[in-house]
């Protein structure tokens, strides 16, 4: 029996159908990779499956007693609480039961309290609740997290680990993960792959990391303009099946278009069409017109181009014996020169100080010792990991070009609505607030703004987070 069944699901956001009467089911031990363009409704669907949001219409059924855990795209924690306290929230129900058991154990006994103690005992045993502290500590140890450190001092990757730990300690039957690899370093992603493959429950995850999908998924489910389609196997298998499907669909559409054109010529002749025996043919023509009108044409492609600034000097940045420490050394005696035309990748584990090093190179923070010098005629476009530059109350149009309907790209004027359309934001959405966008759409908007500014140095801190597969390939 399926763990979760979604039937005739409908969900709309404004004039856009995110779910258009679609179906979905999840079986035991399945690991489903949910894919689709940014803004198609993947995160909304995941929240609906996890019981956090409601459908407009349709039904959602769960197997009785099903335990679920959900990890958000950008987990929110109290920055002053410790890692141990945050992860313990994953066993809040177990903690409450054990506290009640301990209170009843020392209270005056009667038939009701005795019956309640038996109930709690069986619940705790079924949820492995007697040793929840040990489970939390073991999980933190596996994820290399210090239980006593404050959340606010953690990097983006380590905060994601805390959210994963919080979900895992709940021992769920189904794990829902929204962009689980965001902010994780390469070793952490490999570790997460192994963890999910060994996980005994079912997994539904959203990610645009193709290698991760290949390693983890047993099935790919694509959300495309309100409809869910399932493909067995991993992402590589999906690509092969999808290519065949697109080719078959194109052939069928071409045949239908040819037949429709022939029938339109016939109906315009008029005389034959008035005969009684032609009624069936007229009905077929109407049906062909309906099918053509309802056809879901291929989605547009994003157009990425960078507005080039003035040519920079030969040296972009020069670092000489640079050191920087906070509670520990981050950068120690580092010397490097970055030249015009270089493409530099910064690698390192979560919390190692990659973002700090970026800021040292850019001059937004000063080294404790040594010198960091920017070259001449440098125009920097900076894409930051925490997306601090987003004004959620601004409209898309105002965010891209404040106070003007026009922007200049490589010396040519372009209307801001047309420019937004290059990044797959329809003209109708140009006046929507930024707050209505999904995580991936917000990143696409940031890229649109970034590329609209003349620049000769691009600085990208985790640029691929939340972006869909098509956009990633173009980037």
Regions found by a protein language model. Give the residues of each.
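ABC ATP-binding cassette signature C-motif
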Residues: 1-254, 304-475
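Leucine-rich amphipathic alpha-helices with coiled-coil/heptad-repeat character
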Residues: 101, 108, 124, 131, ...
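A short, polar/charged loop/turn motif at coil->beta-strand junctions and beta-hairpin connectors
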Residues: 261, 296-300, 311-313
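Intracellular alpha-helical coupling/juxtamembrane segments of multi-pass membrane proteins
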Residues: 241-284, 288-295
């Amino acid at each position: 029996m399926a763990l979760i069944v979604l039937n005739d699901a409908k969900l709309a956001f404004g004039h856009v159908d995110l779910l258009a009467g679609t179906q979905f089911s999840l079986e035991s031990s399945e690991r489903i990779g949910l894919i689709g363009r940014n803004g198609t409704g993947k995160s909304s669907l995941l929240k609906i499956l996890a019981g956090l949001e409601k459908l407009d219409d349709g039904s959602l059924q769960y197997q009785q007693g099903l335990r679920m855990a959900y990890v958000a795209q950008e987990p929110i924690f109290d920055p002053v609480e410790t890692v141990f306290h945050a992860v313990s929230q994953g066993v809040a129900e177990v903690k409450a039961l054990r506290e009640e058991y301990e209170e009843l154990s020392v209270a005056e006994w009667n038939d009701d309290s005795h019956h309640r103690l038996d109930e709690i005992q069986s619940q705790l045993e079924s949820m492995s609740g007697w040793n929840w502290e040990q489970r939390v500590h073991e999980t933190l140890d596996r994820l290399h997290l210090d239980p006593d450190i404050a959340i606010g001092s953690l990097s983006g990757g380590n905060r994601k680990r805390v959210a994963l730990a919080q979900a895992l300690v709940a021992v769920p039957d189904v794990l829902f993960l929204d962009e689980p690899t965001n902010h994780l370093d390469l070793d952490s992603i490999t570790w997460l792959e192994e963890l999910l493959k060994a996980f005994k429950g079912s997994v539904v995850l959203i990610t645009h990391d193709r290698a991760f999908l290949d390693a983890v998924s047993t099935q790919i489910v694509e959300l495309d303009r309100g409809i869910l389609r399932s493909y067995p196997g991993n992402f590589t298998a999906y690509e092969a099946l999808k290519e065949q499907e697109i080719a078959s669909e194109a052939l069928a559409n071409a045949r239908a278009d040819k037949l429709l054109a022939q029938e339109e010529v016939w109906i315009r002749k008029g005389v034959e069409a008035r005969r009684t025996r032609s009624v069936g043919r007229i009905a077929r023509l109407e049906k062909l017109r309906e099918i053509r009108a309802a056809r879901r044409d291929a989605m547009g492609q994003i157009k990425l181009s960078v507005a080039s600034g003035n040519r920079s000097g030969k040296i972009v940045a020069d670092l000489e014996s640079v050191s920087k420490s906070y509670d520990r050394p981050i950068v120690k005696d580092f010397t490097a020169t970055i030249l015009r035309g270089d493409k530099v990748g910064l690698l390192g584990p979560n919390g190692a100080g990659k973002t700090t090093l970026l800021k040292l190179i850019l001059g937004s923070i000063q080294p404790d010792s040594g010198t960091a010098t920017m070259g001449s005629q440098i125009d920097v476009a900076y894409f930051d990991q925490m997306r601090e530059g987003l004004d959620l109350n601004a409209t898309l149009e105002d965010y891209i070009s404040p106070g003007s309907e026009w922007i200049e790209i490589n010396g040519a004027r372009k209307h801001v609505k047309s420019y937004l359309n290059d990044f797959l934001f329809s003209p109708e959405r140009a006046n929507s607030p930024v707050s209505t966008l999904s995580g991936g759409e917000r990143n696409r908007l940031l890229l649109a703004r970034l590329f609209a500014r003349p620049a000769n140095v691009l600085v990208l801190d985790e640029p691929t987070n939340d972006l869909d597969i098509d956009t990633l390939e173009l980037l």
